[in-house]
């Protein structure tokens, strides 16, 4: 249980309704301020570098008005699992009867492990940024090993999850994606793999050129991993 006097404002903004972010469910999205990666293509720089404006207490008050109107709450960002009180907050939201989805870069495996052990989450979207040789360049971080730990945790957990990769054609090509698919296959992953197209024209952390969608012309799916494309802009 959160104590009111110690609650800061970790949430940058709130999307009150979506049918796109939790498979087959209605949801709202909580956008957490701050991130421990600086992905070159990130088009949420205001969230990554910005400060929160909404407290957990205010968010819970809002969610209580959405009981029986929404199925789920999506925790996104930024990186939602960075915040010290995220586990207690997720527990409070879960008690309201909502399904819980976590969008994460996988950098906090210990937090993810505790959430799994406490049975607080229902669905996870795990960002697979790149293979180790490109990971630091793309994310400006050295967090591949924590990501890998998170992936293995999810594989062992039985929780429904998806793996997704944002692609900018200047940073990731067909060979890179094929290596990533091979890596996922070697871990035992057999789910869907979503390739998210970079949104051209959006403000980003690093200035990048136009991203082309050449990958859509390729049949990248394997016997065990089906590749889907998101973003038709």
Residue ranges with predicted function:
Residues 15-18, 46, 77-79, 106, ...:
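Short, well-ordered turn and helix-capping elements at secondary-structure junctions
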Residues 14, 33, 45, 129-131, ...:
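Generic beta-structure capping elements
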